UniProtKB/Swiss-Prot annotation:
Source species, domain of life: Archaea
A GO biological process held by the record: L-histidine biosynthetic process
Keyword set, alphabetical order: Amino-acid biosynthesis, Aminotransferase, Histidine biosynthesis, Pyridoxal phosphate, Transferase
Catalytic activity: L-histidinol phosphate + 2-oxoglutarate = 3-(imidazol-4-yl)-2-oxopropyl phosphate + L-glutamate
Database matches in InterPro entries: Aminotrans_II_pyridoxalP_BS (IPR001917), Aminotransferase_I/II_large (IPR004839), HisP_aminotrans (IPR005861), PyrdxlP-dep_Trfase (IPR015424), PyrdxlP-dep_Trfase_major (IPR015421), PyrdxlP-dep_Trfase_small (IPR015422)
Gene3D superfamilies attached to this UniProt entry: Aspartate Aminotransferase, domain 1, Type I PLP-dependent aspartate aminotransferase-like (Major domain)
Keyword match Protein transport: no
EC code: 2.6.1.9
Pfam families: Aminotran_1_2
Xref: HAMAP family: HisC_aminotrans_2 (MF_01023)
Originating organism: Thermococcus kodakarensis (strain ATCC BAA-918 / JCM 12380 / KOD1)
GO molecular function term, any single one: pyridoxal phosphate binding
Name assigned to this protein: Histidinol-phosphate aminotransferase
Length: 336
């Protein structure tokens, strides 16, 4: 009864349990301040709970558009970025999608779930994309998916390499989920390249992983097409109210981003050659230390495949010092 393709899938798993430090999901270490929560509750008081939310999430789209200086028609909002990825893999003409492993696995997941083949163009040794090879593979592709900063390696992709792919005219989805921590983005290319889709989220820099709100910035043509196939009413009234409120307080989040970046660099210096440079809110660490850390109540992300023997570590606050102390112990055990 169940499709063979579904039987072949491995469900997305995370570690659960009574651990003391969680550095595995790239969440913000900062909750919303009490006064912002109160503002959200006030916003919700005027919203009827017995009615469906706006069918295309227009209140949130307008707030995001105003924040970036874009019309709401250039914005799509989803129940997390994953929902939008699920539509984007199906939206464009072509024989397959192109991905650049090691990278975020949900591009391939949703493509294969929908019977769409996946062509992989691996990252170079320095984890940058090979724009020439991707452009060649893109000729028959429906879309190319590039994460910048890349998850799990943490690096921004060179603009000149992304441009090589954009010049093909094929749909290019650049996942900028962590871009606020990088200080550089591709927003300025939207007018020049109508085939560009920027995918972003409120889960990281805006401390809203629990609200599940992702969004896409793209040409009006792409956004209109996306809403032709998108489930109606998918972004609830709570999520839309939260978006409107947090975007009224950009200064708070800019300061938090600066603090996370400062901590990232401090932790990276402490780890020395074990840590790769990062433009995100996490570090890729060359250390087979997952089990060692777990035994000490510290949860990090264990990596596999090309990154076997590596871990991905979210930048926290005071948790960072406990992690660094445990890593010093691990280095002693490992003889480093």
């Amino acid at each position: 009864m169940i499709r063979n393709e579904v039987k072949a899938f491995k469900p997305y798993r995370v570690i659960e349990g009574n651990y003391r430090i969680w550095l595995d999901k790239n969440e913000s270490p900062y909750d919303l301040p009490e006064e912002l929560k109160e503002e959200i509750f006030e916003e919700l008081k005027s919203v009827p709970f017995n009615r469906y939310p706006h069918i295309t999430s227009m209140p949130a789209r307008e707030a995001i558009g105003e924040f970036y200086g874009l019309p709401a028609e250039n914005v799509a909002v989803g129940k997390g970025g994953d929902e939008l990825i699920g539509y984007l893999v199906r939206l464009f003409e072509g024989d397959y999608i192109v991905t650049t492993p090691p990278t975020f696995g949900m591009y391939s997941f949703y493509a294969r779930l929908n019977g769409i083949p996946v062509i992989e163009v691996p990252l170079r040794e320095d984890f940058t994309i090979d724009g020439d090879t991707i452009a060649e593979k893109a000729k028959k592709a429906s879309a190319v998916f590039i994460a910048s900063p890349n998850n799990p390696t943490g690096n921004l992709q060179p603009v000149e390499e992304v441009l090589k792919v954009l010049e093909t005219g094929k749909a290019v989805v650049v996942d900028e989920a962590y871009v606020e921590f990088a200080g550089k983005d591709l927003l300025g290319l939207l007018d020049e390249y109508p085939n560009l889709v920027l995918l972003r989220t409120f889960s990281k820099a805006f401390s809203l992983a629990g609200a599940r709100v992702g969004y896409a910035l793209a040409s009006e043509e792409i956004i209109e097409a996306l809403y032709r196939i998108k489930s109606p009413f998918s972004v609830d009234i709570f999520a839309q109210a939260v978006v409107k409120v947090v975007l009224r307080h950009p200064g708070l989040f800019r300061e938090r981003i600066r603090e996370i970046v400062r901590e990232r660099e401090r932790v990276r210096r402490s780890l020395g050659e074990l840590a790769y440079p990062s433009d995100a809110n996490f570090l890729l660490v060359k250390a087979d230390a997952h089990s060692f850390l777990l035994e000490r109540g510290i949860v990090v992300r264990k990596l596999s495949g090309r990154l076997k023997g590596h871990i991905r570590v979210t930048i926290g606050r005071r948790e960072n010092d406990a992690f660094l102390k445990a890593m010093e112990e691990w280095k002693d055990v490992a003889g480093l």
